[in-house]
Amino acid sequence: MAEPLLSEFQHQPQTSNCTGAVAVHEERNPDRPPGAEERVPEEDSRWQSRASPKSGGSPGHGGEGSLEPQPSPLKTQVCPESSCPEAGEKGQNGDDLSAGGAPPQQRQVGKKKHRRRPSKKKRLWKPYYTLTWEEKKKFDEKQSLRASRIRAEMFAKGQPVAPYNTTQFLMDDHDQEEPDLKTGLYPKRAAAKSDDTSDEDFMEEAGEEDGGSDGMGGDGSEFLQRDFSETYERYHAESLQNMSKQELIKEYLELEKCLSRMEDENNRLRLESQRLDGDDARVRELELELDRLRAENLQLLTENELHRQQERAPLSNFGD
């Protein structure tokens, strides 16, 4: 009963569930054709079948006691590891892992996977809004050089190049020289004032020394006035651009009326100023006349005093 079982297993190829056993089996017999059976050495007792006679048995031809080398029966090796692929399992590329096509990660079991570690050199990174003006300027210059280099490389390769977007105009606006509004050296006030100086003159001089009511000097007031004029002109131009034709005509007529009204007011003020100038001339003449009369009165008083002294002199001589 043992011969039919042995003959049935002799013609079946050796199979294995572990890919490592298949690889070792192929390395031992690289030149063996795929259909050929492997001869088992006689001295190896592990490959003898259970039906073969033990030591001391009688030889026979094809029987149980024959000493002829028999081909090895079917041996199935079970892989103890759970990572070995089962029969019919396929990899990522569709390869049959059970037929020896194991991925290199499973073949190299002892090699560890390389893990990239962070650099020991710490990168001093700070948010852009926390940088100072000098640090922002250096950062923008570095980014500008890098962008110029990349744009040059893209232009050399024939790729379309867009203009570099930068914030340098903000730095230029910040670096503009602005007038010093608070650190001016103002002249000191006089320690003593004359008695004939009025309070109004004193307040005017104090306002001029302090640079006006806002506490700024002449440069600061000019800067504010120029800034206001530029802002008003820009706003007025934008408002005119947004107006329609009818609105522009209406605005023009209103401006003409305002101009004529201002001209009439100017003429009236000019006439009043001329009349006031005439009155001032009359007042000036009267003041000169008053000064002349005062001088004459003083002269008459001195002459009268001299006459009185002359009259008293003869009376004193007569009494002696």
Swiss-Prot record:
Residues 163-166 are annotated as: Interaction with P-TEFb. Residues 109-124 have a biased composition (Basic residues). The modification Phosphoserine is found at residues 98, 194, 198, 213, 221. Residues 271-316 are annotated as: Required for inhibition of ESR1-dependent transcription. Residues 247-275 are annotated as: Mediates interaction with CCNT1. GO terms for biological process: activation of innate immune response; heart development; innate immune response; negative regulation of transcription by RNA polymerase II; negative regulation of transcription elongation by RNA polymerase II; negative regulation of viral transcription; positive regulation of signal transduction by p53 class mediator. Residues 1-124, 174-223 are annotated as: Disordered. Residues 111-138 are annotated as: Basic region. GO terms for molecular function: 7SK snRNA binding; cyclin-dependent protein serine/threonine kinase inhibitor activity; identical protein binding; P-TEFb complex binding; transcription regulator inhibitor activity. The keyword Secreted does not apply. Residues 24-47 have a biased composition (Basic and acidic residues). Residues 244-310 form a coiled coil. Residues 9-19 have a biased composition (Polar residues). The coiled-coil domain mediates oligomerization. Transcriptional regulator which functions as a general RNA polymerase II transcription inhibitor. Core component of the 7SK RNP complex: in cooperation with 7SK snRNA sequesters P-TEFb in a large inactive 7SK snRNP complex preventing RNA polymerase II phosphorylation and subsequent transcriptional elongation. May also regulate NF-kappa-B, ESR1, NR3C1 and CIITA-dependent transcriptional activity. Belongs to the HEXIM family. This is Protein HEXIM1. It comes from Bos taurus (Bovine). The gene is HEXIM1.
